[in-house]
Every structure is written in C-alpha cells, then in structure tokens.
Amino acid sequence: MVEDPIPLPNASMEVSYQNPIEAATIPVQIAVAEPVATPNPPPCLHENKFLVSVEVCLKPSSTARLEDVQRAVERMLENRSMSYADGLVLIPADDLFLVDNVQRICICDTEEWVKNNDVLLFWQVKPVVHTFQLIEEGPCEDLCADGQPASFNEWILPAKEFDGLWESLIYESGLKQRLLRYAASALLFTQKGVNPNLVSWNRIILLHGPPGTGKTSLCKALAQKLSIRCNSRYPHCQLIEVNAHSLFSKWFSESGKLVAKLFQKIQEMVEEDGNLVFVLIDEVESLAAARKAALSGSEPSDSIRVVNALLTQMDKLKSAPNVIILTTSNITTAIDVAFVDRADIKAYVGPPTLHVRYEILRSCVEELISKGIISSFQGCDGLSIPSFSSLKEKLSESEVHDTNTVPWFCKQLIEAAKGCEGLSGRSLRKLPFLAHAALADPYSHDPSNFLCTMIETAKREKSEQPE
C-alpha cells in the first residue's frame, strides 16, 4: 500500500514487499507520487469496486475479539487516501488499540486486478478485512499400535508452521488464484443449498506433476489461506494429512480397520458445528499402484479392498458441506482413474519457468540481504529487487556493465535463473545456501561475488541432475 497524491491528514504510510513474516519489522518508505490533474471525480461508493483482501494477524498475546480488531482496521483504512498494492501496511503509532493487538496488516492478491505493475486507487477498492490469530501448537499425530506408522497428522488452522507459506510459493498462470476461487465457489454452492443432483461438485482437488514442485506445500498453504478467509463462517478449521502408505497393514483385514478409524475421526470433525475440515492425501498414486497390483495378483486382495473402502468413504464425505479433499500425485500416468473422475480440478504443477525461477531466487536474495548475509547494492531501494515483469524498465545498456548496480544485479540474477532450467522449486530454494557454502570467504558480504558463485553453483547442480 502506498500513498495517494491527494493530500489528506495522516495519509502517510509505509510498506515493504518482503516476506510478510519478516517485513513487519522492516518498513520501506515509498516515494510520494506527483499530483495529477483529475478532471473527473472519483466514482461514487455505490459503483462496482475491486474486492481486495486485507489480512490482519493478531499478536499471540492479544485477547481482543476478532470482530473488534476488524472494525478498527476498517476505520483506519476509511480514514486514509491511498493506493493499493501487495505489501505490508505500517500500523499507525497513534492507534494504541492496533499497536497493542496487531502483529501485521497485509494487502493480498491485488495482482489479480492490475496489470503492468499498476496500483489500485482507493476509490476503486472495497477492502475485505480478515482477522486471525495463529495457532502455535504443532501437529497432533495419530498413534497406532503394533508399530504401525501414524495414519494421519492433524493441524489446527491457521497454524504458525504454515505462516508465510502461501506467499513463498510462486507459479505461472494464476494457479493459486484459480484454487482460491474454486474453493470459494464450492463452499458457496454448498452454503446456498444448490442441488448436487442437478449441479455436481465433489470438493476434491488433484495436483499432479514431478517431485519438488511444491504440490504438497500448495495444498497446505491453500488450507491455511482458506481458514483465514472463511473464519467468519467457519471459526474452527483443521487439516488432516493422511499417510497413504500407512493404510496398508501386513495383517489380513487390518487395513480396512485403519481406513474406518481414519474416516471415523474425520466424520467426527465434520459433524461439529462451525468446523471446516481439509483432508490431504499425499502421493495418491501409491493407492492406485496397490490396486493395480492386487488386480494382477501380485498383491493380496486385501489391498484392493482398502482402496475401494477409501473411495467409498470419500464419496460419503460428499454430503458434508464443510470438507475439502486435497490430493497430490508425483506420477501423472499412475493416477487412478477413480480419483481422476472424482476430482473437480486436475491441475498440473510443472517445473518452474524462467520468470518463476527468477522470482524464487529474487525472494531468496532479498532474505539474505535483510539478514545481513550479503550487502545491498548501489541504487537498490531498501531491500527491494525489481521484479521480472519490471526488468525492461531497469536494464539499460549504459548501466548493465557497472557492477553493484541494480541493472547489473538483475542481469546476473537472470543468468543464474537461466542456469537453473530443469531444477525443481525445492532445489532452487537450496541454491543460495549452496552458493554461500561454496564461497572462499563465507564472511564476505560482496553481492557481486555471491551472484557469480551462485551462477556457477546453478550450473554444477544442473550437471549433477540424473538423466
């Protein structure tokens, strides 16, 4: 969020475009735009506006009611004339209620409405404020007897463990927004009582693609995001991560009991009023492989009964209005047809493109700069490195050869991103660490030396990838 040229009292605001977890303590001053003549007045309040999400995270020590904080933030936004862009809003020092209770205020997902790095003006926007408080408890593991692995892990959402996960995942083609809109529509259709015999939807999402592309993380981040966006309707949210491999027991007929126990637990959660339940089944192709093996005679018939029981239990959950099933698969060709037919969305999550690779490395380097591991560079505005979409404005031939300048830095970062073609997002996140470990002087803060080393590290990592 940045200032609007219209001068109003207390209209100044600071914003940082860093990871929301860290950026709350590192505000960056944004320059004020020059006044522009506006022959036409802003649109009236009754005209259509863009809905922009404003997420407000309460401090762990806060005992304030979420509704009170929501109203306080809405009043703060109404009293300010600003432009809207993704980033953190500095909490006004004179608002003691917000200072005492709010950890951060974040503007989210404005890129869905704007193009070419534009911003939304205050009269174009209707802020939708979501208040939440993170749960600091870790996952609760289901303990099984006889040395069996746990059949599921349970999180209460929104969990501190998943804080910032949504923002750290970068994809092309609006995948994250597509999933958000799907989930919102699925819950709305259920809430409005749409007849499922006339309009069918199963509330099942299938993400498939090669390993390391963030499918499981995206499912967890989606559950976290929806627990924040839907907390006025569902004040209690839980994530159940099913361990598909644990559903197969070495004892005959025991596997069916494990499935029954698992879904009995899920059914109890679903029946609670005001509860929203997310069921995550990771590596769902393992179930498909077991069923095929059982049909061919190489596995006991108990395996196929487990898979069929699981599918039957999933069908039973269809009648529950407050459950969403998230599934992932690493092997697209091995996905069971029964699962494919049930999924409303079947999204392929492939290796990162050049644009995505650059943005991932950019976020990593900004984090290292903010922690003082490497130094900033000449012409850098605080910790912000230009995004991939704005590079054409930054890369001029006259400056690109001057080291430690923004154009040179971006050019080197692009070279590193090009050298990472074929690497997964998981490998890309490790690259800055491996590059720093390869430095002759690990205490050197020279950004040019670090980037050159990262380019070499990227080439080495790519050459060591299996064919």
Swiss-Prot record:
Pfam families: AAA (PF00004), AAA_lid_TRIP13_C (PF23242), TRIP13_N (PF23563). Gene3D superfamilies: P-loop containing nucleotide triphosphate hydrolases. One of its GO terms (biological process) is homologous chromosome pairing at meiosis. ATP binds at G209, P210, P211, G212, T213, G214, K215, T216. Its main location: nucleus. InterPro entries: AAA+_ATPase, ATPase_AAA_core, ATPase_AAA_CS, ClpA/B, P-loop_NTPase, Pch2-like. The keyword Transport does not apply. It comes from the Eukaryota. It is found in: Chromosome. SUPFAM superfamilies: P-loop containing nucleoside triphosphate hydrolases (SSF52540). Disruption phenotype: Reduced fertility. Reduced number of seeds. GO terms for cellular component: chromosome. Keywords: ATP-binding, Chromosome, Meiosis, Nucleotide-binding. GO terms for molecular function: ATP binding; ATP hydrolysis activity. Disulfide bonds: none annotated. Belongs to the AAA ATPase family. PCH2 subfamily. Plays a key role in chromosome recombination during meiosis. Mediates meiotic chromosome remodeling and crossover maturation. This is Pachytene checkpoint protein 2 homolog.
